[in-house]
Amino acid sequence: MDQITITFPDGKTREYPRGTTGLDIAKGISPSLAKRTVVMALNGTLTDLADPIDDNASIDFVARDDARALELIRHDCAHVLAEAVQSLWPGTQVTIGPTIENGFYYDFFRNEPFTPEDFAAIEKKMREIIARDKPFTKEVWTRDEAKKVFADNGEAFKVELVDAIPEDQTIKIYKQGEWFDLCRGPHMTSTGKIGTAFKLMKVAGAYWRGDSNNPMLTRIYGTAFAKQDDLDAYLHQIEEAEKRDHRKLGRELDLFHFQEEGPGVVFWHAKGWSLFQSLVGYMRRRLAGDYDEVNAPQILDKVLWETSGHWEWYRENMFAAQSAGDDAEDKRWFALKPMNCPGHVQIFKHGLKSYRDLPLRLAEFGVVHRYEPSGAMHGLMRVRGFTQDDAHVFCTEAQLAEECIKINDLILSTYSDFGFEGELTVKLSTRPEKRVGTDEMWDHAERVMATVLSEIKAKGGNRIKTEINPGEGAFYGPKFEYVLRDAIGRDWQCGTTQVDFNLPERFGAFYIDADGAKKAPVMVHRAICGSMERFTGILIEHYAGNFPLWLAPVQVVVTTITSEGDDYAKKVLAALRKAGLRADIDLRNEKINFKVREHSLAKVPALLVVGKKEAESHSVSVRRLGSDGQKVMPTDEAIAALVDEATPPDVKRMRGAA
C-alpha cells in the first residue's frame, strides 16, 4: 500500500498508509490524545478528524480548549439549534446558520415568527441533544440525491442552496444522529463536545439572501464558549455595553439626535458639538507644524470620479445629483465626495513639485457622504454623512518607511491621550490577487511595511500585538489597520495607513526627481480616528459618559445652597470662564441634594457648591463626580486645580517640553 509522510508540530515525521484518518493517527499516538482531540489542522486548515489523508501533510491535533476550536463549538451549536427548532416545531424550514463574531445565528422560515419567549424551550431541547453526544458524521451525496431528499422533506430553501453550489464542488451532508444538514464543515467529533456554555441572545427579521423581494425569515442569534466563565464574562460585557450605549447616553446627556428627515446624518446639540470640537481641536494641535490643513470641495463633477475609479467601482455608495436649471450646456452630473483623496491629489498637482518639496502632508477634516442601507445604520457608529480626520502624505519610495513610523507614533500617542491604554493590534494586509502596480512595487512596499511592523512591535512592547493578513490589502497597495481595545474589552478598528500606487498615476500627478525626470509620488492615506463621529461614539461608550475633565462638554457647574449665595456664585462663574473653563451655573430654588443628583446624572465632572459661608471666606465646596465627599478650598486654588486638570494631555506635553 502507498505510504504518505505526516509531519507533526515538533518537526518529526512518520510514515502511514495512504487514506489513514486523523483519528487513526491520534489513536496510534495515545488513546488520551484521540479522546481530547475534536478536529485536526491539516496543512494549517481545520479538517474533520475522520477525514482520510491521501497526500503528504503536516498535522496538528486541536483540543476543545484550543482557541482554534471556538468557531467549531459555535458552528456545531448552530446545527444543534436548528435540530432543536425542527424537533419542537415540525415543518419549520432551516436555511443557513453561519458563525459570526462572538457567536452564530440560524435563519428559519415559519409562518409564525419566533420570539425571545421561545428561547427557554429551545435551549432546553439543545441541552438534551448535546447530552446525547451523537457523533457528527459526513456523507457526500450526488446533487440529484440531495435535491430529492430536501424536496421530499419540504426544505425548498435547501434545494435552492444545493443548486447554488458550483458543479465542481461536492455536496456534503453532516449528520448528528437522525438529523442532518447541508454544510461545508468541518465539525467536531460529537455534539457532546459543544458543552453547555451557550445562550440564545436575540431574534431579528432577515430576508432570504438579503433581498426584500424574497420571504422574510426569523434569525435567531446565539453565542457559545468553551467555558462557562468565558460565557459569563461575555454576557457581563454585553450588559455593560447596553448601559454604555452611546445612543442611550446621547439622549440622556443631550449630545445629539437623529430623525427621519435626515437618515444617517447627525443633529449635534450644543454639548455634543462641544465634545466633537474638543476632538477636532486636539487633532488640529497634533498636526500643527507637520501637516498642511486643506479643504477640498464637497461636490465635484462625475468626470473626476470617473478618473479616480470611484464612479465605476463605488457608484452604488455615492450620492449623485444633476445640476439644476434649463441651460443644456450646464447639465452635468455631480457627486458628493465619498472620500477626500481625489481632492488632495488635485491640490498636490496645483503647481510644479520637486523632490525637495517631499514629503508633502495634506490633512483635512473633510465631510464625506456614503450610502448605507437603512438597516445597517447604527447611531454614530455607522452613518451616511461623517467627518474624516483624513490626511495624505505624498513622498518618495525612500521616505515611505520613515513616514509610516511617524504616522504610527502619532496614532499610538493619540489613542493613549484619549484613554485607550490597553492592548492594541496592528495588522499588515498584503497584496490581493487582483491589484495594480508591478510586483517590484509591491515587493518594495511590503518589505518596508514589514520592517516598520517589526519596529512598531519592538517599540510597543507588550501593549502592541501585530498580525499579518495575507491577501487582505487594497488593490492599490498594502495597509496597516489599528485596532484599539476599550474599557470593557471590545475591539474597534479605527486607524489606517494605506499605501497607494494607483491614484497619483490615474490623475497624472508627478514630481521632478533629482535627475530631472518626472516621477509619480507614493501616496499614503492616513486616518487616526477614521470617522470622527464614530470615534466620538466610541469615546462615549469607553467612558460611559464620564469624560475626563479636558473632554467634558460642561466641565464645572457652580450651584448655590440658598439664594444668599447667588451673587458670589456669579463671581465664581465669571472667574471660571475667564480661566478658560466650560462652566455653567445653577441658581434654582431647589434643595442642594436635588441639584447635586441632577448634575451627577448629567455627568458633570465637578460641582462647586457655594453659600453664605463660602462667600464670606472666598472659598468653594468641591464635589467630584462619583465621590460622596466634598472638599472646601479657596476659590483661586480650586480654579487653578481645575484648569490644570482640564489642560489637554498634548498641551501639557508641549508646555513640559518648552
UniProtKB/Swiss-Prot annotation:
Q: Where is this region: Catalytic?
A: 245-548
Cell location = Cytoplasm
Assigned GO CC terms: cytosol
Gene Ontology MF, one: tRNA binding
Q: Which cofactor does it need?
A: Zn(2+)
The Enzyme Commission number assigned here is 6.1.1.3
Instruction: Quote the InterPro entries the UniProt record gives.
Output: aa-tRNA-synt_IIb, aa-tRNA-synth_II, aa-tRNA-synth_II/BPL/LPL, Anticodon-bd, Anticodon-bd_dom_sf, Beta-grasp_dom_sf, TGS, TGS-like
Domain (TGS): give its ranges.
1-63
Q: Which GO terms describe its biological process?
A: threonyl-tRNA aminoacylation
Keywords attached to this Swiss-Prot or TrEMBL record, sorted alphabetically, are: Aminoacyl-tRNA synthetase, ATP-binding, Cytoplasm, Ligase, Metal-binding, Nucleotide-binding, Protein biosynthesis, RNA-binding, tRNA-binding, Zinc
Q: Which reaction does it catalyse?
A: tRNA(Thr) + L-threonine + ATP = L-threonyl-tRNA(Thr) + AMP + diphosphate + H(+)
Q: Provide the residue positions that the database annotates as binding Zn(2+).
A: 341, 392, 525
Pfam families on file = HGTP_anticodon, TGS, tRNA-synt_2b, tRNA_SAD
The superkingdom of the source organism is: Bacteria
What does the record note about the cofactor? Binds 1 zinc ion per subunit.
Query: What role does it play?
Result: Catalyzes the attachment of threonine to tRNA(Thr) in a two-step reaction: L-threonine is first activated by ATP to form Thr-AMP and then transferred to the acceptor end of tRNA(Thr). Also edits incorrectly charged L-seryl-tRNA(Thr).
Q: Which family does it belong to?
A: Belongs to the class-II aminoacyl-tRNA synthetase family.
The annotated subunit structure for this chain is:
Homodimer.
The entry's protein name is Threonine--tRNA ligase
Which species is listed as the source? Rhodopseudomonas palustris (strain ATCC BAA-98 / CGA009)
| UniProt gene name | thrS
